[in-house]
Swiss-Prot record:
Domain of life from the UniProt record: Bacteria
Residues annotated as site: Interaction with substrate tRNA: 102
Renumbered residue ranges of the record's region Interaction with substrate tRNA: 36-39
Function: Catalyzes the transfer of a dimethylallyl group onto the adenine at position 37 in tRNAs that read codons beginning with uridine, leading to the formation of N6-(dimethylallyl)adenosine (i(6)A).
Taxonomic placement: Bacteria, Bacillati, Bacillota, Bacilli, Bacillales
SUPFAM superfamilies reported for this sequence: P-loop containing nucleoside triphosphate hydrolases
UniProt-recorded name of the protein: tRNA dimethylallyltransferase
GO BP annotation list: tRNA modification
Cofactors named for this entry: Mg(2+)
Length: 305
């Protein structure tokens, strides 16, 4: 069976992935699968820079607004859903295009990636849940440094699961993770967008300003009023900082500046992930040749299939 060609567009937040994905979809008869772990949630629109129907410009998109914030959409679920979508899109004669910045989710699609399918120990999990996120992450770092490198301290649920698997199996959680062999079903072209660091940070700061103008405070306030502040999906950048403001522990300007700062740090982590974990063909973003260069790479890739 021939491998399914898939275009994958990755890069840090605010670098221009969405625009490029639309261009490629129009030129190569593609359909787009979102590779963003936050855009799957309904009601998280402004804070996740979710693509609008107008921006979709008639291109079919998947894995956007598929579940409520209180219902976790895990990497394992993303892997299963995306693999099914790739096959469906390909079988209809279209080109599957994945676009996003969630490295773990995207990588899981193309590599033989396990998720620690050990059974549960609810009592142990409750015990861990009483600890603060910093203590938990430090425990993981001592027991399994490789996993600690890949799981952010703020992802408390994921850190707890890693510790639970170690507790149950006696093996590092990282052993269940990536095997660096591509899944035989797919032939991906990984395109990465990069931008001068200062220019990227300027874009991020402007994007946050625009989010506030578009109503981010109101969007976060609705989630706050619905008592969703402890839901893992809501603890993402752009929401958690405003919850601190709603609690009276910061000013609105301080919350905005913290969102900008955290977004810049997140972009740096994204770039580190993609550069260290995936074999990516990098393209300079924000220049007149960005789209043309990407299209030439896709043409060459498809011609070789």
């Amino acid at each position: 069976m021939s491998k399914i060609p898939v275009i994958v567009i990755v890069g840090p937040t605010a670098v221009g992935k969405t625009s490029l994905s639309i261009t490629l979809a129009k030129n190569f008869d593609g359909e787009i699968i979102s590779g963003d772990s936050m855009q799957v949630y309904r009601g998280l629109d402004i804070g996740t820079a979710k693509i609008t129907p107008e921006e979709m410009d008639g291109i079919k998109h998947y894995l956007i607004d598929v579940t409520d914030p209180a219902v976790p959409f895990t990497a394992a679920k993303f892997q299963a859903e995306t693999r099914g979508l790739i096959e469906s899109i390909h079988n209809r004669g279209k080109l599957p295009i994945i676009v996003g910045g969630t490295g773990l989710y995207i990588q899981s699609v193309f590599y033989d990636y396990g998720f620690g399918n050990a059974s549960e120990d609810k009592a142990y999990r409750r015990e861990l849940d009483q600890l603060d996120k910093t203590t938990l992450w430090q425990m993981l770092d001592q027991l399994d440094p490789k996993s600690a490198e890949l799981i952010h301290e703020n992802n408390k649920r994921r850190v707890i699961r890693a510790l639970e698997v170690i507790h149950l199996t006696g093996k590092p959680f990282s052993e269940y993770q990536v095997h660096h062999t591509l899944n035989e079903a797919y032939q991906p072209l990984f395109l990465g967008l990069d931008l001068d660091r200062e220019l990227l940070y300027e874009r991020i700061n402007r994007r946050v300003e625009l989010m506030f103008e578009e109503g981010l405070v109101s969007e976060a306030s609705k989630l706050y009023d619905e008592h969703l502040v402890d839901v893992p999906a809501i603890r993402g950048i752009g929401y958690k900082e405003l919850f601190t403001y709603f609690d009276g522990n910061s000013s609105l300007e301080e919350a905005k500046e913290l969102i900008q700062k955290n977004s810049r740090h997140f972009a740096k982590r994204q770039l580190t992930w993609f550069r260290n974990r995936m074999d990516i063909d990098w393209i300079q973003a924000g220049v007149s040749t960005t789209d043309t260069e990407a299209m030439e790479k896709v043409k060459t890739f498809l011609a070789s299939k």
